[in-house]
């Protein structure tokens, strides 16, 4: 039995992973995590929770929701001291880049954080395979919201609102602290059903994403290739 563990930064990354895995052939979701046919985050209660499994029971996929990047070190310590460290074959991290601070890009800062924690768990279990995907594209600063925005089918709306945000930012009373989230909220306000968060949008409006978009395929292929 192969066991793969995905460690996600937050609810948005968990829902994105769920949607991608849920469209993968021969995978079955743990129906204890569902409510009215969709994923319910509050049902992910255990430290490491069974997420999906394949039809012949040769693969189990587990999930851990960090609920914030600052919880990564605590997770690593708990994982190192758990019996699961000997059972898991591969551990994969999906996290935001975020943005530059001082001389460090958000991507470099997040990559260093992940690699430091990979080093810790590999010291305890050298055979544990590891990997990571840092949104939006595993090389640039940004967030999972950027990945979703750039993969939407409504490209004309996306480009229009991106330009609007740039203009609004210049208004004296504008208080835009997170451009990606502000852009995302304005775009989702044009869609039906209207959803105010990335996780809720993924839950109800996943069909509005272009699955063949190169940026989306990059994370989709990372996930699917790592469970082969």
Q: Model-found features: residue ranges?
A:
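Alpha-helix boundary/N-cap detector
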Residues: 70, 105, 109, 207-210, ...
